[in-house]
Amino acid sequence: MLLLELKKTNQTLETIHFIGIGGVGMSGIAEILHNLGYKVQGSDLSENYNTKRLEAYGIKIFVGHTPQNITNVSYVVVSSAINRNNPEVKEALERKIPIIRRAEMLAELMRLKCSVAVSGSHGKTTTTSLVACLFEAAGLHPTVINGGIINNRSTNAYLGSSNYLIAEADESDATFISIPSTIAIITNIDPEHLDYYKDFDTLINAFRSFITNLPFYGFAVCCIDHKIVRELVNNITERKVITYGIDSDDAHITAFNISTDITSSTFDVKISLPNVSGVTIIEKITIPTPGRHNILNSLAAISVGVELDFGIKAIKNGFNSFKGVKRRFTKVAEYNQASVIDDYAHHPEEIKATLSTAKNIANKQHGKVIAIFQPHRYSRMQHLFDDFMRCFDDADLLYITDVYAAGESHIEGISGQSLIDNIIKLKYHNQANFLAKLDDSLEVIMNKASPGDMIIMMGAGNISNFANELPQKFGNLS
């Protein structure tokens, strides 16, 4: 980045091209570079919220991938989703244009900052947003690069005025190990991305490196309610680790006196830091989002705030300012006094957490939970097939669509229909149904929704687009 800064200063501005710029991770980095004064452009297969947002900022966007898109570029940035058969990658290789991985570019942005990297199988995006809110409330105004749209800002990335940078660290291909962070957060570790890691032990070892690569003056924040994280922390002695949890009495930071309602959670916090005498209690912290998993995400942010001495007022004010993250239990529509929720859950553990929250709310409203799930990636479904069969207990009615491939080839025997067939055969759910088309969800909602119901539309594919179009569809029915 120093060389790029020199070239920028000397008025020899070079173009950085992002292949797949509409991806949530890529768009954030592109936006930060643009805001720093670099010349940025990019391409994607289709327009989406992110490409339109970047275009409004003056960033040139190409729809479709062709060699002509990189005619006058000096650097090409790719994510792990872009392979070498991409025509723009082929052109870059042919012309010997440097190809930079997304994680490498993120690392360069973080290198000269005091950086907080948030990783884990689930909860990264919300935790990143919560940490950012606490930094803002403490007057530190960080640069933020997130994996989801932060409702406070209507963007997934923004440039701050301080020397702090907070980033979501994607563990999917082990590149998060190379991120030069000062503070590392691990929310949980579950068997995920095994198409890359091949086995769970390799994934766990990557998280170990994520902590041990910290500088000696840095620290990690880890949730020891999670068995695998606890085992990992117990075997790390060379770096400072702050632990948190709800069920773990031995955690440094714990939540108790928990109460929840439909839109928020309130709890007290007990703080007992290593090498610090005495116990501190923070009473009545409120977060404007429901769910036990979000209390855990909040404890991660509190752990950072306590260690950096933000103060109780800043911590409470930070949470009060939090407005949530797009596609994290987001209400998008209402039909027959039933709420339609759009949620990113696509892993069995995420599905359990989302449905548990929905069940708690539905019970208070004397309603039921209707789950409509779109599986994401054949490889994920293959690796976690048994877990997917067992994760829908809190749904009163279950509907599963076919798999959103996300560019993957079909795997024999892996489909939405096969998942439903096995759920029924093994009696994991007695109200499970297959939806041949996502459009059939509209009929399900119209026929099944009752007052007080929670209709949860889950997945990392295009089910979100469908969910967000429902208000218009309902309007057309009236």
Curated annotation (Swiss-Prot):
<dbReference type="InterPro" id="IPR036565">
    <property type="entry name" value="Mur-like_cat_sf"/>
</dbReference>
<dbReference type="InterPro" id="IPR004101">
    <property type="entry name" value="Mur_ligase_C"/>
</dbReference>
<dbReference type="InterPro" id="IPR000713">
    <property type="entry name" value="Mur_ligase_N"/>
</dbReference>
<comment type="pathway">
    <text>Cell wall biogenesis; peptidoglycan biosynthesis.</text>
</comment>
<dbReference type="GO" id="GO:0005737">
    <property type="term" value="C:cytoplasm"/>
</dbReference>
<dbReference type="GO" id="GO:0008763">
    <property type="term" value="F:UDP-N-acetylmuramate-L-alanine ligase activity"/>
</dbReference>
<feature type="binding site">
    <location>
        <begin position="120"/>
        <end position="126"/>
    </location>
    <ligand>
        <name>ATP</name>
    </ligand>
</feature>
<keyword id="KW-0067">ATP-binding</keyword>
<keyword id="KW-0963">Cytoplasm</keyword>
<dbReference type="InterPro" id="IPR050061">
    <property type="entry name" value="MurCDEF_pg_biosynth"/>
</dbReference>
<dbReference type="GO" id="GO:0008360">
    <property type="term" value="P:regulation of cell shape"/>
</dbReference>
<keyword id="KW-0436">Ligase</keyword>
<dbReference type="InterPro" id="IPR005758">
    <property type="entry name" value="UDP-N-AcMur_Ala_ligase_MurC"/>
</dbReference>
<protein>
    <recommendedName>
        <fullName>UDP-N-acetylmuramate--L-alanine ligase</fullName>
        <ecNumber>6.3.2.8</ecNumber>
    </recommendedName>
</protein>
<dbReference type="GO" id="GO:0009252">
    <property type="term" value="P:peptidoglycan biosynthetic process"/>
</dbReference>
<dbReference type="GO" id="GO:0051301">
    <property type="term" value="P:cell division"/>
</dbReference>
<dbReference type="GO" id="GO:0005524">
    <property type="term" value="F:ATP binding"/>
</dbReference>
<keyword id="KW-0961">Cell wall biogenesis/degradation</keyword>
<comment type="function">
    <text>Cell wall formation.</text>
</comment>
<dbReference type="Pfam" id="PF01225">
    <property type="entry name" value="Mur_ligase"/>
</dbReference>
<keyword id="KW-0573">Peptidoglycan synthesis</keyword>
<dbReference type="Pfam" id="PF02875">
    <property type="entry name" value="Mur_ligase_C"/>
</dbReference>
<keyword id="KW-0133">Cell shape</keyword>
<keyword id="KW-0131">Cell cycle</keyword>
<keyword id="KW-0547">Nucleotide-binding</keyword>
<dbReference type="GO" id="GO:0071555">
    <property type="term" value="P:cell wall organization"/>
</dbReference>
<dbReference type="InterPro" id="IPR036615">
    <property type="entry name" value="Mur_ligase_C_dom_sf"/>
</dbReference>
<comment type="similarity">
    <text>Belongs to the MurCDEF family.</text>
</comment>
<dbReference type="InterPro" id="IPR013221">
    <property type="entry name" value="Mur_ligase_cen"/>
</dbReference>
<dbReference type="Pfam" id="PF08245">
    <property type="entry name" value="Mur_ligase_M"/>
</dbReference>
<keyword id="KW-0132">Cell division</keyword>
